[in-house]
Regions:
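Two-metal-ion RNase H-like nuclease active-site motif
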Residues: 105, 163-175
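Active-site palm subdomain of RNA-directed nucleic acid polymerases
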Residues: 1-5, 9, 18, 28-35, ...
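C-terminal reverse transcriptase regions that engage the nucleic-acid substrate
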Residues: 33-151, 286, 294
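Structured nucleic-acid-interacting core domains from mobile-element enzymes and related host factors
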Residues: 144-167, 234
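Mobile genetic element proteins and their domesticated derivatives, centered on retroelements
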Residues: 6-8, 21, 25, 42, ...
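Acidic, metal-ligating active-site segments
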Residues: 174-190
Length: 317
């Protein structure tokens, strides 16, 4: 159950339980039943016999109109692979309030649009002193949304309930401080349920270290999900975390300190404990099938669309 001010979402596989709960709540609060959930705080929910579809198409169209991008030319990716954003200290400044409004609005949209998570996060790093070069990248995101307003997440009905995760990192991608970006995502069966794109807190000295830190962050999320699911009587062992760097995988299995790892912050090493206790297992995956890649860098159109499909993103049925 989720409560937001005076809005309550509840559900059950047994309709009589829903009715019983609603009756109990009505005894304590003045309330009315709105029926099957179809809309909540900008989130559109379409419940079908073979699954559930989530999207924010109405919100997307409102954003395009609010920021005068509704007549813009559509484009196929939210960010070009040639884009290299930096502070652009000599560039022409742009209104900070407007820029922050655009970023904040786009961040809310990432609740159902993981395909723009990286590009929005990258542009968000320049909110303190936005330039026209940064605005250009933000407008490209809107142009991408112009061509894909109905995209959303599809959660198919399935008996498969495996917990699988993907972890990836670029290396020194931030041109300001050379820190890397971690990207992670987690699936329950075929359903994408969690994703992140976040700049790392320290500068990595190698690709392996950057990937190791990303895997550690992914492990933390997996452990939380695993513990939450155990409250519902669902237990997992050896949850698979997919990584495309063999050196990083080896680091999770080798507790010995040496020149390559002695400087890494101790909090990143907790993944070793969970590997040792068979809570998670890191498995190698080829880079072209690394789904977390979309959360670490701009991709070419073919790879971007492939990963987007694999994440379960479809047009509204």
């Amino acid at each position: 159950m989720q409560i937001y001010v005076d809005d309550i979402i509840f559900g059950s596989s047994d309709e009589s339980l829903c009715e019983s709960f609603a009756k109990c709540m009505s005894l304590e609060f003045e309330m009315s039943l709105m029926g099957e959930l179809t809309f909540f705080l900008g989130l559109q929910i379409k419940q079908l016999s073979d699954g559930i579809f989530l999207n924010q198409s109405k919100y997307t169209l409102e954003l395009l109109k609010r920021f005068n991008m509704d007549n813009s030319k559509a484009i196929n990716t939210p960010m070009s692979t040639a884009t290299k954003l930096d502070m652009d200290e000599n560039g022409e400044s742009f209104d900070q309030k407007t820029y922050r409004g655009m970023i904040g609005s786009l961040l809310y949209l990432t609740a159902t649009r993981p395909d723009i998570m990286f590009s929005v996060g990258l542009c968000a790093r320049f909110q303190s002193n936005p330039k026209l070069s940064h605005l250009k990248s933000v407008k490209r995101i809107f142009r991408y949304l112009k061509g894909t307003p109905n995209l959303g997440l599809w959660y198919p009905k399935s008996e498969k309930f495996d917990l699988i995760a993907y972890a990836d990192a670029d290396f020194g991608g931030c041109r300001k401080d050379r820190k890397s970006t971690s990207g992670t995502c987690q699936f329950l069966g075929h359903a994408l349920v969690s994703w992140t794109s976040k700049k790392q807190n320290s500068v990595a000295l190698s690709t392996a270290e950057a990937e190791y830190i990303a895997a550690s962050a992914c492990c933390a999320q997996v452990v939380w999900m695993k513990n939450t699911l155990e409250d519902y009587g669902i237990h997992f062992k050896n949850v698979s975390i997919k990584c495309d760097n063999t050196s990083a995988i080896c680091l999770t299995k080798n507790p010995i300190q040496h020149s390559r790892t002695k400087h890494i912050d101790i909090r990143h090493h907790f993944i070793r404990d969970h590997v040792l206790n068979n809570n998670v297992v890191l498995e190698f995956i080829d880079t072209k099938h690394q789904l977390a890649d979309i959360f670490t860098k701009a991709l070419n159109e073919d790879q971007f669309e492939f990963i987007r499909r694999e994440l379960g993103m479809l047009n509204c049925p």
